[in-house]
């Protein structure tokens, strides 16, 4: 009996030692991973504060990615390019289609019919609401970028709002620019956005704003994203640059 008890105790101690060794190894790996991630964050922050183009692009990509919109109908897809020479950020942003606006203005219960009936929106209301959405996203995006510019890396930003849809006349896929604005940061930050008429505000900034975005009436972008010169660093270039940095 004593021998079996002693053997059981030895087995328990061996199991405990193995469990502790496994725990210590996992703890060490976790601490190393935390240290590595913290070092990466510190390195990224240092690069961003130094206005390194790759870091500026990656930072602003994170700013826009964290912007919250409804999940239905709002693509939240975008492309970014940055010129360190002019401190200009160019954003090509995918806007929701007009179908994102519900066709029904309201629902009401009709007691005599014991049914719920809907009231359709008027076409003029849909037009106004959609134009307001386009202008709101444009101003909001510029505001978020400039407000988040902790490194003071941006002197101005260009926003091109695009609609990816199908041409109702041909059925072909089309990509239509419906708003384009180039805004100096200091001028923009002086605006009282809560007081402005959004479309009038954009036009005062020199924006090209479609009168009928609901009908895919296009505008000419102030800067064509695909035509930016080699001084601009784009998202793919920025990621490659950050990954190639020495550890």
For each feature predicted by the language model, list its residue ranges.
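Long, charge-dense low-complexity segments
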Residues: 1-247
């Amino acid at each position: 009996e004593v021998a079996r008890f002693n053997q059981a105790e030895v087995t328990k101690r061996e199991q405990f030692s193995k469990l502790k060794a496994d725990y210590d190894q996992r703890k060490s790996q976790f601490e190393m991973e935390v240290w590595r991630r913290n070092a990466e964050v510190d390195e990224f922050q240092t690069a961003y504060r130094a206005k390194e183009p790759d870091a500026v692009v990656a930072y602003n990509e994170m700013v826009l990615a964290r912007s919250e919109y409804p999940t239905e109908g709002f693509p939240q897809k975008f492309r970014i390019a940055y010129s360190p020479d002019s401190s200009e950020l160019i954003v090509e942003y995918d806007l929701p289609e007009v179908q994102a606006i519900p066709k029904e203005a309201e629902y009401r219960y009709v007691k005599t019919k014991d049914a719920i009936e809907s009231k359709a929106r008027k076409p003029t209301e849909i037009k106004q609401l959609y134009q307001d959405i386009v202008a709101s996203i444009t101003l909001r995006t510029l505001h978020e970028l400039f407000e988040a510019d902790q490194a003071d890396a941006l002197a101005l930003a260009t926003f091109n709002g695009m609609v990816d849809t199908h041409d109702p006349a041909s059925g072909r896929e089309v990509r239509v620019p419906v708003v384009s604005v180039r805004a100096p940061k200091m001028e923009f930050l002086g605006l009282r956005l809560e007081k402005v008429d959004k479309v009038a505000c954009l036009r005062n900034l020199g924006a090209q704003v479609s009168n009928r975005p609901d009908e895919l009436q296009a505008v000419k972008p102030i800067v064509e994203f695909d035509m930016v010169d080699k001084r601009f660093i784009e998202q793919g270039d920025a990621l490659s640059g950050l990954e190639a940095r020495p550890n």
